[in-house]
Amino acid sequence: SNEYLKLENKKLRSLINESIESDKILAKVLIDKESPFLRSIVLNKGSKDKVKIGMAVVDQAYLVGKVIEVNYTNSRALLLSDLNSKIPVVLEPIGLQAVATGTGKEYGEIEYIKEKYENKIKIKDIVVYTSGLGGLFKPGLPVGKIARDKITKINFFSDFKQLEYVKIISYSFKGNNWCRH
């Protein structure tokens, strides 16, 4: 029965490993000579690794972008700094919903504030997180901090120029009626 337990243990361990791996896919950032204008990165994981369009890409805990193209061995992720990047966010600790957009530069911008919020920005440290709206990303992924000098400016937590390894996260929204952007 000891052998049986060992076998059970092994099975459980491989199941646990499988579930951990299927949740997060570690990818290496490849040098991308394709376009200096499009702020995107190429990753060494593709459909063979279960990468799908729309998945979140994180650097440690920080959101850096989302997968926009997938082939068998590689994928491309659009960075938060790209002009085409728009993600629903929440500003904490004030709880304001907004949209974070890329500027094509090193920082992001806050758009579509649900209410006038100039008067609320008395707090020094306002952190921008994904809100989870639209089911695109799971809520609570840290994006950046609101700049001291300009309340619509986001300083991203991650330095996109320094990315070497990232994790691709699959997040399935519980519910059928969500749309991908």
Language-model features, listed with the residues they occupy:
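A secondary-structure micro-motif
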Residues: 4, 11-181
